[in-house]
Amino acid sequence: MDFKRVKDYLSWLYYQYQIISCCAVLEPWEQSMFNTIILTIFAMVVYTAYVFIPIHIRLAWEFFSKMCGYHSTISN
């Protein structure tokens, strides 16, 4: 894939984002505030998923393994 096609594709994605989120009709300072809020929410969701999903997967694994009768020698 050449650089121009990638650049055009990313520009198209950004345009789609602006149209879907109605950012195209906002003033520049409103766009920056909106994008900052969206980026902050996205970062918080990613961080929360990174921190808490492995814990929940481990707890679910322990629950179902005990329920099915499999006892691991690794867990205490």
Curated annotation (Swiss-Prot):
Protein task: Component of the serine palmitoyltransferase multisubunit enzyme (SPT) that catalyzes the initial and rate-limiting step in sphingolipid biosynthesis by condensing L-serine and activated acyl-CoA (most commonly palmitoyl-CoA) to form long-chain bases. The SPT complex is composed of SPTLC1, SPTLC2 or SPTLC3 and SPTSSA or SPTSSB. Within this complex, the heterodimer consisting of SPTLC1 and SPTLC2/SPTLC3 forms the catalytic core. Within the SPT complex, SPTSSB stimulates the catalytic activity and plays a role in substrate specificity.
Species for this entry: Bos taurus (Bovine)
Alphabetized UniProt keyword annotations: Endoplasmic reticulum, Lipid metabolism, Membrane, Sphingolipid metabolism, Transmembrane, Transmembrane helix
GO cellular component: endoplasmic reticulum membrane; serine palmitoyltransferase complex
PANTHER family: SERINE PALMITOYLTRANSFERASE SMALL SUBUNIT B
Principal cellular location given in the protein's record: endoplasmic reticulum
UniProt name for this protein: Serine palmitoyltransferase small subunit B
TM annotation in the entry: 12-29, 37-57
Any one GO biological process: endoplasmic reticulum organization
